[in-house]
Amino acid sequence: MTLPVKFPLLLAQGAMGIAVGLKCEILPHNFNELIDASIAYLRDEPFVLYPDFRTGGMIDVRGYNDGERGCKVQVRARITQLDKKTLVITEIPYGTTTGSLNESITMAGEKGQIKIRRVDDNTSRNAEIVIHLASGVSPDQTIDALYAFTQCQVSLNSLCTCVIRNEHPEFTTISAILKESTDRTLDLLSWELKIKLDELERDWHLISLEKIFFEKRIYKILEKDADSWDDQVAEIERAFDPYRQMLKTEITRDDVLRLCEKPVRKISKFDIKKAEEQILDIESQLEKVKYDLDHIVD
């Protein structure tokens, strides 16, 4: 059993897999940008997708190349200068944590690669790493050093967009996955609408049949004596002959049996006006579903 997804979840969340001689890494992408790209594809318009990370930061996508095998990106932390002696990191690179970033900054300080007095990790809901600089140190030079010697800059190299198709790995691109996912979503939506259409048409048929059964007093046949139950059912079927053109589908024996098995209480309380209202409501729903099917890409 499979549970179909109507959204390119693989591209939104990203994924990583390792096999013998092969590593696959698909970076996460922005939800809204994926939606916009899907719409552009359906409208036969060009689109470009780049990774986007929940941890924030800045990204150099010049080597991304639509996620083709061997592509690469560089990710940087967002560092701001609070004053001449203080720097603050508010967004961290993808694949790092505030703990690992803090540790890399401390180690760079111990090696003399950057000159700092201390590092405070004030992270709660959002990242906030405060770096206190040593006296006389340039904030701009320290920022450059942080990118050069710590996890404030991370290179993601040899990325590979690979999916399993027919039990075999297949190298592909981000845009190809998005197009396939969008087509699949279109198929799922069409499938759901067709199921809904069938259900509504079936409901319309049954209620219309029931209305004729009571309004034309066909149920009275059940009060007559008959040689057998089959003869009585056959007579009821024939009684519907003048009204078959009012229906959209053929009347089956199961339809007739369903009507014959209704209890007397149901017959006595049947409300023709309510049935007419139900039929009108179903017809309104049918129009909407048919419109949605005809304009599914609009």
Regions found by a protein language model. Give the residues of each.
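C-terminal interaction appendages of subunits in large macromolecular complexes
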Residues: T2-L3, L9, Q13-D298
